[in-house]
């Protein structure tokens, strides 16, 4: 029995590419956050995590450059394993002040963010409509919220 026979028989992706309807790895000419240029046409980007378009905001870019100059390109791991930096504490302090609370704690991952936020927003009497392609963290957050899915 050939373990890879099933893989060789799977041709849907190849057929989609050949027919020009493959939706992945689309080559973009420009990426301006909430808009992209594809084959010379400016389009709205609906698949991005840049919901507010802040990745291209001049103040965000400037702050990112300063952070890279001070800390490098990453923290190289989560706060749980590699420690909390001053910028983590500063962010939490500023967030707490902004919402008028004594303190704040930011989530360390996108998964945790969606689980915590979505589950907190949904109560037993709420109904949530999910897209079949929603990230697992959104679906799990909805389930944790006890609402009707």
PLM-predicted stretches and their roles:
Residues 62, 66-110:
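Conserved N-terminal alpha-helix of the aminotransferase class I/II PLP-enzyme fold
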Residues 117-136:
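Conserved PLP-anchoring active-site segment centered on the Schiff-base-forming lysine
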Residues 8-73:
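N-terminal "arm"/small-domain region of PLP-dependent enzymes with the aminotransferase-like
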Residues 106, 111-117, 137-138:
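Short glycine/serine/threonine-rich phosphate/pyrophosphate-binding segments
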Residues 45, 103-108, 130-131:
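General beta-strand structural signal in soluble alpha/beta enzymes
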Residues 120, 137-146:
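Active-site-proximal loop->helix
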Residues 100, 124, 144-146:
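Short, structured coil segments at secondary-structure junctions
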